[in-house]
Amino acid sequence: MYFEDFRVGQRFTAGPRVVTEEDLARFTALSGDDHPLHTSVEYARGTSFGEPVLQGSFGAAVAAGLWTRLGLVSASIVAATEESWTYHRPIKVGDELSLAVTIVRLQDSRGGGQGLVTRYNELRDGAGTVIQSGTATALVRAGDGGPRPVNRDVGTVAWGKALAEALTANPAFVSAVASWDGTIGLRGGEHEVHLRVYRGRIIDVTRRSPHGATFTFGAPDRIWADLLTAEESRFGARLMTGEFTSSGDPYEYLRLTKALEIIVDVARDLARTEHTEVAA
């Protein structure tokens, strides 16, 4: 697959792979981490784990290997650029590991011809419990597929403009902000776009408004990817569980709760279209 073949919300699975005694021995030798927690049965019995466990970085290595074996970017990958990883549970000999991947962010390179693909990874055991998780970003070559849809590029100016166009044509949104004067910030991961609203109209879409956002509403990329592609938005439940956060004026945020609900619904509709501007 080339850069333009990916879509935010795409999901892939790989595995399973059973962890062996040989894995533990080889990774210990390779990493140099020979702490008795990994090498001594007697020592490990006295810990909360009860038996030797694999080094934490073993999971990230397995996840990378399972992803590579899918062969999706074998002919297009340029380089890995970034990784963030969290350990939730220990990995032990005998565990059956599988990988669940969601594409959560696509970012065009300035020079064209390639782009950054960020995926959210969950390494799971045989029961489906998440053992480790995290994001990984890679630079991937583009093919000749033409412009890439930006309808799921939350927080970019191109996405914001497409969203603003759809909101302007939505009577419920226009009514919800008919008397409001302010700026709504929408953040996806590290990307944020500002919608300047004046009495029912969105009069500007920008990366940063001169006076900042009245309030900013946002979530990690993986939450937006799930929200935009799920069968149901479950917006209220997501707010209650803290998947989304807000900053800025709390009064204005609460005042525009209905407008935000409409924004989410319109964003989900937009995610099903094919806007192909170049993301900003």
Segments and roles (model prediction):
Residues 1, 82-87, 230-231:
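Short alpha-helix capping/helix-loop boundary micro-motifs
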Residues 2-3, 50, 88-89, 235-236:
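Short, surface-exposed secondary-structure edge patches
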Residues 18-20, 102-108, 251:
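Short, charged beta-turn/beta-strand-edge "cap" motif at the junction between a beta-strand
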Residues 144-280:
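Feature captures hydrophobic
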Residues 1-82:
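Hot-dog-fold acyl-thioester-processing enzymes
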